[in-house]
Every structure is written in structure tokens, then in C-alpha cells.
């Protein structure tokens, strides 16, 4: 997910997507523990998407604008 896509979302959409990603991360971590996870890079990508969403939400909270 690109930062521009996240910035175009409404606050509610971001929160919904954040919750979806967190749930998916939990499921993938469980799969990794059991040994059924095939794409280990997916965990890293989800963590990065979560960080991007949280960063953009914090930027808006502080009034920092990005191009």
C-alpha cells in the first residue's frame, strides 16, 4: 500500500484497514508458529503497511503536510 493511497482514505477507512491488517498479522504469526506459512515476506509487508498508516494518521494529528 502506497502512502498516497493511504492519504486519500478517510479516517474511518484507515482505521478499518488498520484493524484488518492487525488481524491478518495475528493469523500469519500463528501460521508461522505452526509452520504452515508459505510467504514469510507477507508478515514484513503487513507490519510496514501498519506503520505507514499510523505515521500518516500521526502526521495529520500534528498538522504536518506532505506532498
Swiss-Prot record:
Q: Where are the transmembrane segments?
A: none
Q: Which CDD domains match?
A: Ribosomal_L29_HIP (cd00427)
CC annotations in GO: cytosolic large ribosomal subunit
Q: Which InterPro entries match?
A: Ribosomal_protein_uL29, Ribosomal_uL29, Ribosomal_uL29_CS, Ribosomal_uL29_sf
Task: Report any Pfam family annotated for this entry.
Answer: Ribosomal_L29
Q: Which PANTHER family match?
A: 60S RIBOSOMAL PROTEIN L35/50S RIBOSOMAL PROTEIN L29, LARGE RIBOSOMAL SUBUNIT PROTEIN UL29C
Protein name listed in UniProt:
Large ribosomal subunit protein uL29
Report the source organism: Staphylothermus marinus (strain ATCC 43588 / DSM 3639 / JCM 9404 / F1)
Amino acid at each position: 500500500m502506497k502512502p498516497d493511497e493511504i492519504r486519500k482514505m478517510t479516517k474511518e477507512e484507515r482505521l478499518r484497514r488498520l484493524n484488518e491488517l492487525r488481524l491478518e498479522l495475528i493469523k500469519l504469526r500463528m501460521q508461522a508458529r505452526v509452520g504452515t506459512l508459505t510467504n514469510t515476506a507477507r508478515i514484513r509487508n503487513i507490519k510496514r503497511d501498519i506503520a505507514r498508516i499510523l505515521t500518516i494518521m500521526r502526521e495529520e494529528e500534528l498538522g504536518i503536510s506532505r506532498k
